Amino acid sequence: MPTVTLNRIPINYVVTGSGPRVLLIMGAGSPGRVWNTYQVPALVKAGFEVVTMDNRGITNTVGIEGMSIADLAADAAALIEHLGGPAHVIGTSLGSRVVQELAITRPELVVKAIMLATTGKPYPVESALNRGQQALHHAGIDLPPAYTAAVNVLLNLSPQTLADPQKAQEWLDIFEYSAPTTTSPGIRAQTAMDRSRDRLSDLATILAPTLVVGFGDDRMTPPTQGIEVAAAIPGARYQQIEHCGHFGYLEKPDAVNALLIAFLHGHPLPTRL
């Protein structure tokens, strides 16, 4: 994985494929390689150069003190400039808020913007979870990976997925296997970032063609949050994928990828998802 120093911090990134550039920005606590299972292969096959990156705090502790969404957006902007110019930008969860910030502050770098599982203002459930995680961190408590996996599955997946015991166990195994035994300082810093600002009024300044994708069973950022974001951005489109939760890009990858590719190519968006 190449590493480049930008904004005085090392940034890990990977470039795959060729064609119009697409930068994928992951959510809190997850490395860029999470996109590799489904989105990267589909976008490369569709004729795009795909860039994934590790957000500040994922792989090292440089520059994490007092870090903000604006810092993550500045890192993404610096990487786009390093690679030679504007890009389509896609983000999920925290990554979608980074996309918002990037589209507001550096519009010349964003060709099209896609926001998955997004919100433009604080949401009480997410805020309460972040406060709880910070309290555990300050107390020096790391929960057992099996318990963390169960909580993540319940919070981020659809009841329809979990209704199948075999699928539920598969997801539990995946989450437990990938869960760190201790939470790194960088991920703690991501959790502690200020998300209290209501950004809805600022979204009206976004110039890039924008697609907002909501997931019908998302408990972390309910679809109503995404609908608000789309309504706030001039000309933005909103599409909803049912029977998937906050990790809809993993639960319903074919439906998500169909939307991404159609929007980026300028084709009509699929309606049967």
Tell what function each PLM region has.
Residues 146-197, 201-202:
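Conserved alpha/beta-hydrolase catalytic His-Asp/Glu region
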